[in-house]
Each structure stands twice: as C-alpha cells, then as structure tokens.
C-alpha cells in the first residue's frame, strides 16, 4: 500500500489514521523559529463523520486510504438500504442508513450521487449540489404579507423542510442547494 508524508498533505487527501480512513479538510504547515516543523491538520474521519484537529511532525508517513469516489444513480429505498446503480455497467450497490445519514432528505430518484467506497463498501453518500424537488405541503402566501423575512416553511416530496418565498405553492418544483439546505429558485 502506498504511503504519504506529512510534507505532501493537502486538502482532499485521504489517508489512514488509527485504522480508519480520514480526509484532510485543511492543512497548515508551521515552521517555528526554534524546534521542528509540524503540520496542523483539520480532518474528517470518514466512518464516523467526526471532524478533528491534529498536529503531526514534519516528515511523518501515513498509509494512503484505499478509498474510491464513484458516481452512481439513486434508485430507491427499501426501508433498510438505499440502492444505487452505475449507469454504464448497471451494477447495483446498496448503502445502509448510516452511510446515507443526513443525505437521505436530498435523494431524488435517478439523480447522480457520489458514493465513497472503502473496501468496496459505501461509507458516505453525497447528493448532487443542487436538487429539484416538488413542494408537497406549504401554507398559502397571503397577499401583502411582506413583514419579517418574507418566507415560509415548505415540506418537499423527500420530507425535507426548506424556507421558500411566499409565492411558492403546493405542486411547484423548487431548486435547493443540498450543502446549505437553502431555496435557490423555482423550476419552470
């Protein structure tokens, strides 16, 4: 298995720490006036999702994580597993609820999602940055009600609740940013 030195650390690099794959979020190289240089690293453990800050001596070596990101189309949820399919080979992969986690509210059939596989098992599911989902429940916007934020909560077909403008009605399709959970626009 290939190894990587702390001198080669950069954002997005995936390596093994305590027998668990981790991804670097941010890396800062520090060379004090006296003493050995070191790296101050902010990283995310891919299995648990925890974000940590660690300090490593300059020149330390770590094993690269055997982690692969693949793009697969979302098919359906059978209650226990979320099923995805490779649109070229038609190979199907099932991800458990733990791997999907908070992404479940943004999964729309046939949307292409990014699955992170470790030892051929999905450990995280990332939905597309923007999804288009139908509004299934929202209060009617009252004419002239412009006081306050000018928005109202709307429940989407996937169960997610998003704050939308007053003019959005039930049955309309809205575009939502999955990274922030915010309304982006109405789909024509």
Curated annotation (Swiss-Prot):
<dbReference type="GO" id="GO:0005737">
    <property type="term" value="C:cytoplasm"/>
</dbReference>
<comment type="function">
    <text>Involved in peptide bond synthesis. Alleviates ribosome stalling that occurs when 3 or more consecutive Pro residues or the sequence PPG is present in a protein, possibly by augmenting the peptidyl transferase activity of the ribosome. Modification of Lys-34 is required for alleviation.</text>
</comment>
<dbReference type="InterPro" id="IPR013185">
    <property type="entry name" value="Transl_elong_KOW-like"/>
</dbReference>
<dbReference type="GO" id="GO:0043043">
    <property type="term" value="P:peptide biosynthetic process"/>
</dbReference>
<dbReference type="GO" id="GO:0003746">
    <property type="term" value="F:translation elongation factor activity"/>
</dbReference>
<dbReference type="InterPro" id="IPR013852">
    <property type="entry name" value="Transl_elong_P/YeiP_CS"/>
</dbReference>
<dbReference type="Pfam" id="PF01132">
    <property type="entry name" value="EFP"/>
</dbReference>
<dbReference type="InterPro" id="IPR001059">
    <property type="entry name" value="Transl_elong_P/YeiP_cen"/>
</dbReference>
<keyword id="KW-0379">Hydroxylation</keyword>
<dbReference type="InterPro" id="IPR015365">
    <property type="entry name" value="Elong-fact-P_C"/>
</dbReference>
<dbReference type="InterPro" id="IPR014722">
    <property type="entry name" value="Rib_uL2_dom2"/>
</dbReference>
<dbReference type="InterPro" id="IPR012340">
    <property type="entry name" value="NA-bd_OB-fold"/>
</dbReference>
<dbReference type="InterPro" id="IPR008991">
    <property type="entry name" value="Translation_prot_SH3-like_sf"/>
</dbReference>
<keyword id="KW-0648">Protein biosynthesis</keyword>
<dbReference type="Pfam" id="PF09285">
    <property type="entry name" value="Elong-fact-P_C"/>
</dbReference>
<comment type="similarity">
    <text>Belongs to the elongation factor P family.</text>
</comment>
<keyword id="KW-0963">Cytoplasm</keyword>
<dbReference type="InterPro" id="IPR020599">
    <property type="entry name" value="Transl_elong_fac_P/YeiP"/>
</dbReference>
<keyword id="KW-0251">Elongation factor</keyword>
<protein>
    <recommendedName>
        <fullName>Elongation factor P</fullName>
    </recommendedName>
</protein>
<feature type="modified residue" description="N6-(3,6-diaminohexanoyl)-5-hydroxylysine">
    <location>
        <position position="34"/>
    </location>
</feature>
<dbReference type="Pfam" id="PF08207">
    <property type="entry name" value="EFP_N"/>
</dbReference>
<dbReference type="InterPro" id="IPR011768">
    <property type="entry name" value="Transl_elongation_fac_P"/>
</dbReference>
<comment type="pathway">
    <text>Protein biosynthesis; polypeptide chain elongation.</text>
</comment>
